[in-house]
Structures are given as structure tokens and as C-alpha cells.
């Protein structure tokens, strides 16, 4: 009787297990981004993105990025950087099921900087990101292009310009 109970319990637990073809709704991305020059200022930085897909095409993102701002005159100091935290939302325009090449996702983000810095800012961004889903690979390359608007809170002029992002998704 005990054996039958254990077998029944194990069978009931196995019913809820998903097959290997199912994708985990949680993903991480690490990337480097670089923006075009605007008003004698350009930026580059490192990004960390924690994403969750509650439904098939929609994703919610928590972002952290550290940006280094480069003035045209080249006067770089330690205070030319800012650390931003924020979030975003994404929608898969083309997904791997309908398009064999991979997934094309449209994302909108909003971040704000932490601490006191000359380059304290609020950042608004929209971008297209391409990545390939593969069951054979744990790491997929991510390529993104988009437009970023930064509203600086100090004497620095606001920044508007395109950016390119390259990274790894796992």
C-alpha cells in the first residue's frame, strides 16, 4: 500500500513538470552599449537586464546600467559616470515560432540615476532587440539598436541620440 501511494504521488508530481521544449520565462542579459555624439557628449556603458515573460509575447524588465559620459573635449574624470536603475516593458514583434531567424522585440525603458553626480539623469529609451532562441545553446547573442533621451538634472545639456547594444542573453 505504501509503494502504491508513493508511485501515485510521483506520478502526480510528474504531471506538472514541463517538457524541455518549454522556455523559462525568466532571463538575464548582460550587454555593452554605445551612443552617438549629441551636443558634444557621447556615452558608453554596461547594462544588466533581468526580464520576465508572464505571457507569450510580453516581457517585463528590471534594468541596471552604468554609463560613462565622454565630452567632445576629452576631459574625462571619475565623476563622468552615472549608475541608473529602472524598468521597462517589451513586446515581441516577431518570435521564434513564426520567424525562423529568431526573435525581434520592441522595448521601452525608463531609468533614473542614483547618488549625487554631475551627470545625474533620467533616461528614456526605445529600441529593437534581436536574439535567437536555441535549445542547443545556453547563451544567445543580443543585438539592439534604439533611441535614447537623457534629461540631465544639472548644468549638462540634455542628450538625444541613437545607440547600439551588443550582449549575451541567458
Model regions and ranges:
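Gram-negative (and chloroplast) outer-membrane scaffold detector with strong preference
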Residues: 49-141
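Membrane-helix boundary connector in multi-pass membrane proteins
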Residues: 131-133, 148-154
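Outer-membrane beta-barrel "beta-signal"
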Residues: 89-93, 157-170
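Solvent-exposed loop/turn segments connecting transmembrane beta-strands
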Residues: 33-45, 73-79, 112-122, 151-159
Amino acid at each position: 500500500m505504501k509503494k502504491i501511494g508513493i508511485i501515485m504521488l510521483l506520478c502526480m508530481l510528474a504531471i506538472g513538470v514541463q517538457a524541455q521544449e518549454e522556455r523559462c520565462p525568466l532571463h538575464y542579459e548582460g550587454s555593452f552599449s554605445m551612443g552617438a555624439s549629441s551636443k558634444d557628449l557621447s556615452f558608453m556603458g554596461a547594462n544588466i537586464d533581468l526580464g520576465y515573460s508572464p505571457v507569450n509575447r510580453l516581457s517585463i524588465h528590471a534594468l541596471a546600467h552604468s554609463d560613462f559620459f565622454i565630452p567632445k573635449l576629452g576631459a574625462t574624470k571619475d565623476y563622468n559616470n552615472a549608475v541608473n536603475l529602472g524598468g521597462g516593458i517589451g513586446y515581441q514583434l516577431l518570435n521564434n515560432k513564426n520567424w525562423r531567424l529568431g526573435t525581434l522585440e520592441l522595448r521601452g525603458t525608463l531609468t533614473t540615476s542614483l547618488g549625487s553626480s554631475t551627470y545625474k539623469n533620467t533616461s528614456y529609451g526605445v529600441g529593437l532587440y534581436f536574439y535567437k532562441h536555441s535549445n542547443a545553446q545556453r547563451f544567445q547573442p543580443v543585438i539592439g539598436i534604439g533611441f535614447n533621451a537623457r534629461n540631465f538634472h544639472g548644468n549638462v545639456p540634455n542628450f538625444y541620440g541613437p545607440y547600439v547594444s551588443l550582449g549575451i542573453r541567458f
